[in-house]
Amino acid sequence: MKEKAHQVYRTRGGVVVPSVTQVIGILNKPLLVNWANKLGLQGIDVRKYVDNKAEIGTVAHRMILDYFLDQETDFSEYSKEVIDKAENSFLSFLEWTKDREVKPLFVEKSMISEVESFGGTFDFYGLVDGEKTLIDFKTGNGIYQEYFYQLAGYSILLEEAGLNVRKGMILNIPRTEDERFLVQSVDSLEREKKIFRHLLSIYWLEREVKG
């Protein structure tokens, strides 16, 4: 499971188009640089720290998707420590579902925009307490604004397919005790969609310049 091929998105005409995450990747992330510098000053090996937490996050994320897809993934490549911590993360997600009616319509669904020329694979689109909700599951130490730009990209894909989004939601699931379970939702992604479209335009302009 550790080696996952990079998803390539092509239009019906065979044109390779960017993913939502590639488009969002245009943004500079100074907070990550500051965070890495802080760890370095504390004598922490940033690469090992990130790799360990990334593995926990990857497994926890997969467990959540498997829950909705009613399937099981073989995690034997991962250490017991990683799996145990990921299971704790998954349990915190299950706790969140207890007070809500969560009904998936699409899980881990890939879509391509023939109109705007980009693709993406979103985590969850379905009903949460009766509202059509787009959810992205994150595992990290906070919720950042660009996560909603990412949701906006997925929202554009869904709307092109004739599916409306009433609410966008980010669930940040903790991997370790120093992180918190966080939920943020928005009733409109209109501003975020404008930003995403600007980023998409920049992506294509840069691609032209670079040839």
Residue ranges: model-predicted function:
Residues 1-119, 211:
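Metal-dependent nuclease catalytic cores that hydrolyze phosphodiester bonds in DNA/RNA
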Residues 109-202, 206-209:
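Nucleic-acid nuclease catalytic cores
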